[in-house]
């Protein structure tokens, strides 16, 4: 269980002393090794984003949770969807698109290549701006991604000697959580599932580790826990042999996560997620319905408004 106690004092000072830049010119963008920068440098850069009004979105998932493809699908929806079919919102990358890593993702998707997973000790920071065509409110977000192996170190599942990156991530997350962060908690359907309702060892491990992460926040840093939101994302949803509601699946296969979701409903959301057809390292077809639902949910959480006006939702 991660312990975040005693990690907030330094980070709050950085945030309060930082002036907005409003130009997207941050020192740390794209993919980097955590060891490249000191805690001070990383926290200052995050503080600049917070001062600029950016909402911090942190995907959390174990290895093989589909986190890299989840992020790729979000970028695909933002910049590769058919605007004739869906022109509900616009996206932009502040600063240098090449440095941000967005172009690298788009180039891979154009070749139908699956993106490689984030490696241990890596950190990827991607800034995006989103606005609805029907609203004046724009949201500015920062996607902050760490490897599944480092998430395992946070939850205590991985107990090797290399805990340096995990300790650094704890400091980073403490700063993020204090500024209304949103955790996208990815938990995949077991690809070997035979029958809905029979929890496998895979299900139990996923349930235990993701619940450990969340309860670690609540018990060791309750004030930080109360300032964040959790969006539970059931990835690889297309692998289910039988259709059930996301709530029912969570209850049957992630029971402790379901207890969190149902007991603290004001802090939680839940969506099923599928990126489409992937065979090996090749994307056969990417489906953009799931990323659209994610972006719509995110916009509503950040603004209190739906991307679409009521009349558009009725007739679309």
Feature locations, PLM:
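Switch II of P-loop NTPase G domains
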Residues: 120-130, 136-179, 192-194
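A short hydrophobic beta-strand->loop->alpha-helix junction that borders the nucleotide-binding pocket
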Residues: 91-94, 146, 187, 274
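Intrinsically disordered, low-complexity boundary segments flanking structured domains
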Residues: 62, 111-116, 129, 254-261
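Short, flexible boundary segments at extreme N-termini or domain junctions of P-loop NTPases and their
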Residues: 1-60, 64, 215, 219-220
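Conserved GTP-binding G-domain of TRAFAC-class P-loop NTPases and closely related GTPase folds
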Residues: 171-175, 181-316
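Extracellular structured ligand-interaction cores
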Residues: 54-56, 125, 138, 227-229, ...
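Conserved G1/Walker A P-loop phosphate-binding module
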Residues: 37-119, 135-141, 149
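Short, hydrophobic, well-ordered secondary-structure elements
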Residues: 63-64, 71-75, 141-144, 177-188, ...
